[in-house]
């Protein structure tokens, strides 16, 4: 097994980490940053930009620049959270044939998995550039409160990116691993991980125990909201700016896609600035224009105003904290440490509310942007077998069950059950001579199945005729270490059985995944071709510049035929540069270098002759004799202006 990288696939930013021995290393991307914006832009010429380069061009290409796509992964188009995003996002969210929420870009429908795969591919390449070897395996993190469909979709995104996802791990659990591994405190410690990221919120209560020299991380409970995060905070600021601008100037910016993209950038910047200062100015010249001319936006935003705008959002994080404490069977006073994860936890008001609830200051020795990726890398090392002193016991965040008579949700596995786990229960038919049963699998906490999320359904057919209640049908649930569910149904009388991995009514089919992998490989090949073309083009342009300059300066040393040959080769290469044929450009560059060889030889000979002449002149000056007497030092007698000295460099201050 090779190196397993740890990837934090975030809503706003992503991060990649590896283990070097027992030390974790967060890897800088090609721009030198330790985190990469989770933004993907699709250019007109087919080029795909990921990260900072995509973010930079977002203002001029808002409809084809995708951000916060993690909020759509594994979701149905009809879900209320998705419907809410449709009105807010500059890009077009559409319904796929299977009912999932997809995105339309330049007339092509893309799944959230494909877009996420572009981000994962960038993280994969970041690791490969650092390690100098191919990377094929990863541990990817997800919010603890992600349901089965969202976990499966994240795994599929990894496959499309060319990664074998060895484990899906919960973000708060990963952060706890990063925090707890180097702590020397003895005895059991209970920690709360409060994770408020760009698009999701999680809280987990985790017990770290020392068991015979092994660190055991046991998740006692988890709770959260997969549609609450920094993006919502940004939106509150954007809405405020729009309403203030409308009051002052009578212009509504809410339907101006270009203006909205600039407002998004400004809101994010203002939010970050207000974590360190009491007020900030938002200045956006030429934000829009009407018949009277251009309009400029200038608004002062104070920290107090920001806090009043987002107070209700921060308040929404407290109910899950309360529930997590209750489900863990502990009290707030039992919590030893509170760890903050996610960029939003830098906001003073968030820290204040967390302190108020838990009754203690949160720890400051955890990097909120990097801890999750670091924890994923640690888990990767555990999976390779290199690390044997860590045991991770995670839980399923939501109850799982099936629909039974009357539409009731019969729970098979309750929330916060340690995984992996198995459970089986026997059911029977509802009607006489019923030939088949449909098993509908749901996830959620509501008493009626219709109030929960339908994960999938399948049939068990060929049940022999019998009175209702007689057939014995065993339904088994099996959750693997990734939190992904496998369900089976077996007729005990006939031995007939049927099994599925839950992904039937949602997500991508195997054919779609394979097609997307092929598309990604084609894109990678295309990217390689483009890079090679750019490199050849750069060499050619440098050759044209160099030869043209040398010809102008030293062309008089050549005869007319040689000059004409070089000029013709330059012209041929310039023509080739107008096209996209890499081989033609390379050939013409080689031809130009061959044609200009004579020029190079003449320049070299001229340079050698000049150096020889210089040496001869210097020798004559030092020879003494008829040219004038000199003393023993070689200094002409009576010349007081010539001084013997050691030469040393003097640095200018």
UniProtKB/Swiss-Prot annotation:
CDD domains: ASKHA_NBD_HSP70_DnaK-like
Pfam assignment, any one: HSP70
Residue segments, region Disordered: 607-653
Annotated keywords: ATP-binding, Chaperone, Nucleotide-binding, Phosphoprotein, Stress response
Induction trigger: By stress conditions e.g. heat shock.
Gene3D superfamilies, alphabetized: 1.20.1270.10, 3.30.420.40, Actin, Chain A, domain 4, Substrate Binding Domain Of DNAk, Chain A, domain 1
GO molecular function, one term: ATP binding
Highest taxon above the source species: Bacteria
Function: Acts as a chaperone.
Family to which this protein belongs: Belongs to the heat shock protein 70 family.
HAMAP family: DnaK (MF_00332)
Name listed for the protein in its UniProt record: Chaperone protein DnaK
Organism this protein belongs to: Verminephrobacter eiseniae (strain EF01-2)
């Amino acid at each position: 097994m090779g190196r397993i990288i740890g990837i934090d696939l975030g809503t706003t930013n992503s991060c990649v980490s590896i283990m070097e021995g027992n030390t974790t290393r967060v890897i800088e991307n090609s721009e030198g940053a330790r985190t990469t914006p989770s933004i993907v832009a699709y250019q007109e010429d087919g080029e795909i930009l990921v990260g900072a380069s995509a973010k930079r061009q977002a203002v001029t290409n808002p409809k084809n620049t995708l951000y916060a796509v993690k909020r759509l992964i594994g979701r149905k188009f009809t879900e209320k959270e998705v419907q809410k995003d449709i009105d807010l996002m500059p890009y077009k969210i559409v319904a796929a044939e299977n009912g999932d929420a997809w995105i339309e870009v330049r007339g092509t429908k893309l799944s959230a998995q494909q877009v996420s795969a572009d981000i994962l591919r960038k993280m994969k390449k970041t690791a490969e550039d650092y390690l100098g070897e191919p990377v094929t395996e990863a541990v990817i993190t997800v919010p603890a409160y992600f349901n089965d469909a969202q976990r499966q979709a994240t795994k599929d995104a990894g496959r499309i990116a060319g990664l074998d996802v060895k484990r899906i791990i919960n973000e708060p659990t990963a952060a706890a691993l990063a925090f707890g591994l180097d702590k020397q405190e003895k005895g059991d410690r209970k920690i709360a991980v409060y994770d408020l990221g760009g698009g999701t919120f999680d809280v987990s209560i985790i017990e770290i125990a020392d068991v015979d020299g092994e660190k055991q991380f046991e998740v006692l409970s988890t709770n959260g909201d997969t549609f609450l995060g920094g993006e919502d905070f940004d939106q509150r600021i954007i809405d405020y700016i729009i309403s203030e601008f409308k009051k002052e100037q009578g212009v509504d910016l809410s339907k101006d896609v270009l203006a909205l993209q600039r407002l998004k950038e400004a809101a994010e910047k203002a939010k970050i600035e207000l974590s360190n200062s009491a007020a900030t100015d938002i200045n956006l010249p030429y934000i829009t224009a009407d018949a009277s001319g251009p309009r400029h936006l200038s608004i002062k935003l104070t920290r107090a105003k920001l806090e009043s705008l987002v107070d209700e959002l921060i308040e929404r994080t407290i109910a899950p904290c309360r529930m997590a404490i209750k489900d863990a069977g502990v009290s707030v006073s039992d919590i030893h440490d509170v760890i903050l994860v996610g960029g939003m936890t830098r906001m003073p008001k968030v820290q204040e509310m967390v302190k108020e609830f838990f009754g203690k200051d949160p720890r400051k020795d955890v990097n909120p942007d990097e801890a999750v990726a670091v924890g994923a890398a640690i888990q990767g090392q555990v999976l390779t077998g290199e690390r044997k002193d860590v045991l991770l016991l995670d839980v399923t965040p939501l109850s799982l069950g099936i629909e039974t008579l009357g539409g009731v949700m019969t729970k098979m596995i309750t929330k916060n059950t340690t995984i992996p786990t198995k459970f089986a229960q026997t059911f029977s038919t509802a009607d006489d001579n019923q030939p088949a049963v449909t098993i509908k699998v749901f996830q959620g906490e509501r008493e009626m199945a219709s109030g929960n999320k339908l994960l999938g359904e399948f049939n068990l057919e060929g049940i022999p005729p019998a009175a209702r209640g007689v057939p014995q049908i065993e339904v088994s649930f099996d959750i693997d270490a990734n939190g992904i569910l496998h369900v089976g149904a077996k007729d005990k009388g006939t031995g007939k059985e049927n099994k599925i991995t839950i992904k039937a009514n949602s997500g991508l089919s195997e054919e779609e995944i394979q097609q997307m992998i092929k598309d990604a490989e084609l894109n990678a090949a295309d990217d390689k071709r483009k890079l090679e073309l750019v490199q050849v083009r750069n060499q050619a342009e440098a050759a044209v510049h160099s030869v043209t300059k040398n010809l102008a300066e030293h062309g008089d040393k050549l005869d007319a035929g040689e000059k004409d040959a070089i000029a013709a080769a330059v012209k041929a290469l310039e023509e080739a540069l107008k096209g996209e044929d890499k081989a033609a450009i390379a050939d013409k560059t080689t031809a130009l270098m061959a044609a200009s060889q004579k020029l190079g030889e003449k320049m070299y000979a001229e340079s050698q002759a000049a150096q020889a002449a210089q040496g001869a002149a210097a020798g004559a000056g030092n020879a003494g004799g008829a040219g004038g007497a000199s003393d023993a030092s070689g200094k002409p007698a009576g010349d007081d202006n010539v001084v013997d000295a050691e030469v040393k460099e003097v640095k200018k201050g």
